């Protein structure tokens, strides 16, 4: 029976070097292969021209190079670009380039589907099929960086893990991808320009805090009232607000990095004064700021955007309590590329 070939990009530099020495070949050959894979983006062994034919054949015998491909590209009227990314096993994920006058932000996915069940999110309606590998996350960033330079004449400035999936339910691969993105051997991007958004997996927040991460953390909160949050995000019954707060305090103690709370305000759900007061009280307990996010419809009439006066009431209360707040206007709504809309609908 033929032995299955391993994806070579799952190997570290040290593992590549050891592969060559185990075949009585110089270790530096591993460095050459590593450069082809990560600096030059090679998708086949044939093009690794500084390796002999016999060395390339050796690699072919033992490994494959799995890579992503853009299956479909859609451009929004506002310039946003949504990619349907085909993985090596046929699954699809979506990633988005969000341009502004001064920034180019990549919104990347971490899972095929999602592990969680947030009622307001289109991705949650998809069954989680598997986690993305580090190279599949990294490749999304590389692809979007190319698009930013092609269409907007500038490299990526920011990365947000706010696409399909819960990053902390795939945290090892997410962290490995970030290591590669920030490494001089990868894209060399500052970790301070990377934000990982989570629905609040408290145990993993604590575990990651121990590793002295340099990226920013955002929490999909939506309500600081337990009953309301559980109704919106049923899985949060396992991660109550008091436990989440303690985990976030631990994060701040370890990193000294403020948390961003993400809050979508819906009509009749979390637009009352009690909701505002609860959020203000919660934010006061840990260094934080708030992003108020416009709701993007997903074809489910149980949710509707709150009235402007409700958003204004939130903004005023937060500012009055010296809590930084930004109202985020969604981009790419016309191509289902906005926050909460990624669901492989058009493929």
Regions from the PLM with identified roles:
Residues 145-321:
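Conserved AdoMet/S-adenosylmethionine-binding subsite of the radical SAM
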Residues 97-98, 173:
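Residue-level structural signal for beta-strand termini and adjacent loop
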Residues 99-142:
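Canonical Radical SAM [4Fe-4S] cluster-binding loop centered on the CxxxCxxC motif
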Residues 76, 109-110, 197, 220:
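Short linear Ser/Thr-Pro motifs
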Residues 81, 93, 104-108, 116, ...:
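Generic beta-strand structural signal
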Residues 1-92, 99, 249-258, 265-347:
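Auxiliary Fe-S-binding modules of radical SAM enzymes
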Residues 13, 115, 201-203, 226, ...:
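Alpha-helix N-cap/helix-start and coil->helix boundary motif
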């Amino acid at each position: 029976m033929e032995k299955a070939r391993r994806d070579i990009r799952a190997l570290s530099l040290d593992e590549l070097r050891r592969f060559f020495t185990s075949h009585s070949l110089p270790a530096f050959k591993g460095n050459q292969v590593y450069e082809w894979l990560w600096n030059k983006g090679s998708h086949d062994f044939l093009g690794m021209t500084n390796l002999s034919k016999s060395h390339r054949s050796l690699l072919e015998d033992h490994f494959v190079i799995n890579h992503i491909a853009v299956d479909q590209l859609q451009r929004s009227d506002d310039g946003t670009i949504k990619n349907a990314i085909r993985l090596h096993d046929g699954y699809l994920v979506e990633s988005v380039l969000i341009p502004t006058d001064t920034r180019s932000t990549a919104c990347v996915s971490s899972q095929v589907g999602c592990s969680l069940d947030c009622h307001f999110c289109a991705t949650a309606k998809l069954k989680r099929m598997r986690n993305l590998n580090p190279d599949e996350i990294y490749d999304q960033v590389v692809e979007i960086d190319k698009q930013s330079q092609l269409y907007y004449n500038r490299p990526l400035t920011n990365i947000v893990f706010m696409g399909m999936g819960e990053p902390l339910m795939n945290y090892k691969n997410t962290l490995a991808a970030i290591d590669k993105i920030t490494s001089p051997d990868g894209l060399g991007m500052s970790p301070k320009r990377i934000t990982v958004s989570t629905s609040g997996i408290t145990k993993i927040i604590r575990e990651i805090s121990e590793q002295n991460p340099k990226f920013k953390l955002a929490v999909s909160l939506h309500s600081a009232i337990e009953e309301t949050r559980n109704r919106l995000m049923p899985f949060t019954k396992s991660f109550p607000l008091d436990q989440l707060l303690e985990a976030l305090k631990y994060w701040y103690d370890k990193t000294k990095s403020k948390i961003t709370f993400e809050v979508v305000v819906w009509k009749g759900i979390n637009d009352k004064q009690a909701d505002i007061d609860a959020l203000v009280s919660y934010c006061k307990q840990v260094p934080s700021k708030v992003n108020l996010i416009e709701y993007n419809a997903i074809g489910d009439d149980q949710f509707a955007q709150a009235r402007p006066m409700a958003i204004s009431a939130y903004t005023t209360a937060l500012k009055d309590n010296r809590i930084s707040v930004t109202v985020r206007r969604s981009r790419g709504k016309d191509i289902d590329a906005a926050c909460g809309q990624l669901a492989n609908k058009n493929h």
